[in-house]
Amino acid sequence: MAVNVRDYIAENYGLFINGEFVKGSSDETIEVTNPATGETLSHITRAKDKDVDHAVKVAQDAFESWSLTSKSERAQMLRDIGDKLMAQKDKIAMIETLNNGKPIRETTAIDIPFAARHFHYFASVIETEEGTVNDIDKDTMSIVRHEPIGVVGAVVAWNFPMLLAAWKIAPAIAAGNTIVIQPSSSTPLSLLEVAKIFQEVLPKGVVNILTGKGSESGNAIFNHDGVDKLSFTGSTDVGYQVAEAAAKHLVPATLELGGKSANIILDDANLDLAVEGIQLGILFNQGEVCSAGSRLLVHEKIYDQLVPRLQEAFSNIKVGDPQDEATQMGSQTGKDQLDKIQSYIDAAKESDAQILAGGHRLTENGLDKGFFFEPTLIAVPDNHHKLAQEEIFGPVLTVIKVKDDQEAIDIANDSEYGLAGGVFSQNITRALNIAKAVRTGRIWINTYNQVPEGAPFGGYKKSGIGRETYKGALSNYQQVKNIYIDTSNALKGLY
């Protein structure tokens, strides 16, 4: 199914600053393409340092009034944003599919509705937030207030462009902050279209959207003296740079980074549930998910039962046109990512790994214009293998046989990452014991890759700092102020 791109996407986009689309300080633009077809979708402005200065100054000015709005006012505006997102769900979902390559069934069911729900959720969180008063003694009391930090500088990755933006924007503005946010230069279009909703609902300057290269304007955002809080979703390598910028400027940072998560299948697992959960863990969004269950640890008693079922399941996945409602896996987001995946397949072939399913780029039936890859299952001898240690970020699953629960825990923890993981078992006590022992920020039991609001998401170790997607995330964007009152009017004397 082909659509008229201009029904969804403008030919050119400026920078969204102070509630308007404006020209950048440079005439340079970046071409944005559809990874499934190679078609040019739009051209975006390539922001420069001067544009970052402009956006931050606007955000600082807007903060003066926005931070004084009531919680109920902010909550209503967040609800309005969520409502308008849902009213335009089909359009924005199609933009996300065209720009990212993911199936329309996912963008319609997950990306856009969950983004809308985050605005609704944080509207309720801020509306019900309460401070505290503590009577220290009969004459003194301590009041605790939660106040906005100021200007938030955020950059989000290309794998969930709109959803990740909502994870940042909703709590930031709910808390009374303003924000300067930059999407990936390859997948900015959904957020730029949603800027029109911000234009309708929010005061000018509360949300500002820059487009450009992460190494240029993204880096300038994180190193700007006028930015009071950093928030980043992306690779661990870039996360180090953001952490360094935060340390240099002595500002807080929320970092959601890479992962190499273990999905553990115990010998008492419901295999139907496990097969579905394994596919959700590694094939959702073409495997371009930081929390992907990319290491499969299977109990030796069921290994020979489970692997053939997975081989069959992987071979039956429909990979193809992302606009087709029947498509289960679309295109990888770009050539660089496809080449990275292929390099790991090549490494597997040159090692003692065994490719059990997939392992090839798909080029038939018109897929040669895009970056399509087969669901791939690879058996590796142990967890020290390159494919078991490094984040591939694609539909490539390594499978390792384990003899018992403790070995599964040990292997799961033998990683520099600690973002997520899964356990499949009919014995909830057994599953909980493993979940508690695995050092990750999120563990799913008998499911995988469910990402609703109301459940904290974030990682241990090199997977990041901080948690998002739950009410505690509001504190990422707040300062705590204590007001200490003495009502005695009595002289205390020097200590």
Swiss-Prot record:
<comment type="similarity">
    <text>Belongs to the aldehyde dehydrogenase family.</text>
</comment>
<feature type="active site">
    <location>
        <position position="256"/>
    </location>
</feature>
<feature type="active site">
    <location>
        <position position="290"/>
    </location>
</feature>
<dbReference type="InterPro" id="IPR015590">
    <property type="entry name" value="Aldehyde_DH_dom"/>
</dbReference>
<dbReference type="InterPro" id="IPR029510">
    <property type="entry name" value="Ald_DH_CS_GLU"/>
</dbReference>
<keyword id="KW-0560">Oxidoreductase</keyword>
<protein>
    <recommendedName>
        <fullName>Putative aldehyde dehydrogenase AldA</fullName>
        <ecNumber>1.2.1.3</ecNumber>
    </recommendedName>
</protein>
<feature type="binding site">
    <location>
        <begin position="212"/>
        <end position="218"/>
    </location>
    <ligand>
        <name>NAD(+)</name>
    </ligand>
</feature>
<dbReference type="InterPro" id="IPR016161">
    <property type="entry name" value="Ald_DH/histidinol_DH"/>
</dbReference>
<dbReference type="InterPro" id="IPR016162">
    <property type="entry name" value="Ald_DH_N"/>
</dbReference>
<dbReference type="Pfam" id="PF00171">
    <property type="entry name" value="Aldedh"/>
</dbReference>
<dbReference type="InterPro" id="IPR016163">
    <property type="entry name" value="Ald_DH_C"/>
</dbReference>
<dbReference type="InterPro" id="IPR016160">
    <property type="entry name" value="Ald_DH_CS_CYS"/>
</dbReference>
<dbReference type="GO" id="GO:0004029">
    <property type="term" value="F:aldehyde dehydrogenase (NAD+) activity"/>
</dbReference>
<keyword id="KW-0520">NAD</keyword>
